[in-house]
């Protein structure tokens, strides 16, 4: 083996391995202290790009879950208020039935009307004051809003909240009253007992109801017969013996038309819009009609509450799915970017041992040129 003074190859080799061990030790310490095995693009360019995309998706999913929870909160707030609206309407219905009883005097009905007016005011107050985050929910101003429940654009769900004020047309319907009242001796005559009602059902389109009353039926029995033939309208009789028919705006579109011999004899007047806001139970006829109006309003409220319940269930399932996606996305990101501490501590120990060994060898290699002095004597 040649003895050189100017070039110490052994020292250079030891130095190179010492630098390599030091770099490996520094890298392991960086990974262990940060918790990430990818801290710079040079660590893993492709892995960094993929993990960043997954991180963006994960953060988007977190926001989507918060958005969905906000949507559920809005629906719960609105549905809770509508529950009280339902209670008010049920009380109004009870009062309407009570007022329609013949044992009540005019003063009794006026007192009942006062309670109905107070209930109506509270119903409207609930509709006007129910809010979430400054947004009014039930007075008709919320309309339709979108809720972003996905990590990317275009993943939105629409929520509509209806107007729950008592003067909303959907909280009632149309009233048709016969111009000619019938006394207790009036009966349906043979050959003049037909009545046709043409109306447009929102679900099935235009329909014509053909009714043939029995000979000898009085006006009350005629109303009962009409109610027994179809659930698309409600018939009742007022104090003056006038037949009145109510159609629900939630089910019937537009106005109904009447034909047949009975229609000519009774002479129905033009349709009149009626809602919970116009309820008047100071008369028997008004009390009877009020029951039908409240039933229509209850149907409207219950239908919307069912929609909100379905909306909440849908969002709960959406949140479960988002959480599942987020879990898998983060698991994938972790496999790419996170430090494996067991593996990295092993690598650190290895690099520390190699560093110490390289330092020891380098120290010995630096002493090799001293052998030349021995040769010089």
UniProtKB/Swiss-Prot annotation:
InterPro entries attached here?
Answer: Flagellin, Flagellin_C, Flagellin_C_sub2, Flagellin_hook_IN_motif, Flagellin_N
UniProt KW keywords: Bacterial flagellum, Coiled coil, Secreted
MF annotations from Gene Ontology: structural molecule activity
Q: What is its main location?
A: secreted
Q: Which compartments is it annotated to reside in?
A: Secreted; Bacterial flagellum
Please list the coiled coil stretches: 103-129, 301-340
Any single GO CC term annotated in Swiss-Prot or TrEMBL for this entry: extracellular region
Query: Pfam families given for it?
Result: Flagellin_C (PF00700), Flagellin_IN (PF07196), Flagellin_N (PF00669)
Keyword rRNA-binding on entry: no
Its biological purpose: Flagellin is the subunit protein which polymerizes to form the filaments of bacterial flagella. FlaC is not essential for flagellar synthesis and motility.
Protein family membership = Belongs to the bacterial flagellin family.
How the protein assembles, per its UniProt entry? Heteromer of multiple flagellin subunits including FlaA, FlaB, FlaC, FlaD and possibly FlaE.
User: What name does this protein carry?
Assistant: Flagellin C
Q: Which organism is it from?
A: Vibrio anguillarum (Listonella anguillarum)
